[in-house]
Amino acid sequence: MAEDKGVKNMLEHLVKNLLVEDVEEIELRNVTIELDELELDLKTVAQTLPVEIWERILKPEVEEKEREVEVPEYEPPVEEYEGCVAEVQIGATRSDGGSRDRVVVLGGERAYFPFEEPRPNPPVVTFDVFDTPDVGIPGPIREELGDVIEDPVDWARTVVKRYGVDIVTVHLVSTSPKLHDAPVEEAMETLEDILDAVKVPIIVGGSGDPEKDVEVFVKAAEVCEGERVMLSSINEDMDFERVVEAAKEHGHVVLTFAPVDVNLMKSLNKKVLNRGLSKEDVVMDPTTCALGYGIEYTIDVMTRIRLAALKGDEHLQMPISSGSTNAWAAREAWMKEESWGPREYRGPLWEAVTATTVALCGADLLMMFHPWAVQVVMEAMEYMAEGRVTGDAYVTDVIA
C-alpha cells in the first residue's frame, strides 16, 4: 500500500509540474513501474491550480480575428428566348370604333420568369356574370352578391362599380337546351343591355351546348360589331369554323378550348389560324383543374405551352385564359362541413389560390366568381406587376 501511495504521489507531482511549467512532454528514463492497474485522477491536480494558471491555460495564445467573408453577388440565370407571346386587345374605345371607356391587353411576354423580364401586361381578372341565376351558384357567392344575381344587367353594373373589375364575362347560359332553351334573340337583348350599362370590355360566354353556342356566337359577333368582344369558347366538337368567320368579319377575339392537352390545344389553334385569324385575335384555354382536383395537370400543361411559345412555336404564342371559377367544383370550397372550417372563408380562399397558382404558370386572364377572391387576386396581380401592394391584399382584411 505504501508503494502504491508513493507512485501515486510521484505521478501527481509530475502532472502538476507538467501543467504549471507548460511542459509539453515528459520522459522517464530507467524507470520501471509494475502495476496491476493505473488510474490518473487529473481533477485532483486541476483543483489545486491557481486562477492565474487557469487563465494562462485557457486563454488562446493568438486571439482570433473576425474574418470578413466575401459573399459573391447572386445573379439569377437569365435565358434569352427566340419567341414571344402575342398581345391581344379586348374591347374598343371610341377612337377604335367602339364605345368602351378602356381596353384590356393580354400577353406580350418575352420571358418565362419575371426576373428575366417583367410581364408587360399583368394578368387580368374578369368577373363572371350569368344571364340567369338558375345555374347552381354556390351558397357563399349568393350570400355575398345578394339580389343582384336576379338581374344580369344589375349584376354586371355592380361588379364594375363595387369591385372595380376591368372586364366582365357574360355567360348566356339561358340558351342551353338543357336549361331554359332561351331564343338567341332574347339572349342578344340581354347582351345589348349589358353593353349599355357598363363600359368595360365584354367577354361573351355560351352555355356549353356545341350546337346552340355556334348560333349564339355568330349572332353576338354581329350585335357587338365594333366592340371587339371575346367569344368564349370554341372547340373541336362544334362547328367552330363559323364562329371564326364571324369573329374575323366583325373584328372580335375568339377563345379556343382544349381539355388539358398541349397537342390538342396546338392543333385547334393551328386550324383557327389557318382560317384567317391572327395570333392577335386568339386567346387559349387549356383547362383549369381546381385546387386539389388535378391542378398539377394544369400547371404542367400551362408551363409547357408557355415555354413552347417562347421557344418559337407560333401555334402556342397566344395569351392563356383560366376558368379559375372551376375551383368551386371542389366540394371543399362549398360543402357545409364543420371540421373543414367556415365555408364562407374556404370557398374564396380555394378560388384565390387556384387563380394565383395558374397566374404564376403563365395565365393572362383569370375568370373568377367570388368578390373576396376577386379582390385578393387583383391585389396579388398588382404586386406581381409592380413588386408592391397598394392596398390590403390580406384575405382577412378583405373579409373584414
Curated annotation (Swiss-Prot):
It holds the Pfam family CdhD. One of its GO terms (biological process) is one-carbon metabolic process. Belongs to the CdhD family. Heterodimer of delta and gamma chains. The ACDS complex is made up of alpha, epsilon, beta, gamma and delta chains with a probable stoichiometry of (alpha(2)epsilon(2))(4)-beta(8)-(gamma(1)delta(1))(8). Part of a complex that catalyzes the reversible cleavage of acetyl-CoA, allowing autotrophic growth from CO(2). Probably maintains the overall quaternary structure of the ACDS complex. HAMAP family: CdhD. NCBIfam families: cdhD, PRK04452.1-1. This is Acetyl-CoA decarbonylase/synthase complex subunit delta. The lineage of its organism: Archaea, Methanobacteriati, Methanobacteriota, Methanomada group, Methanopyri.
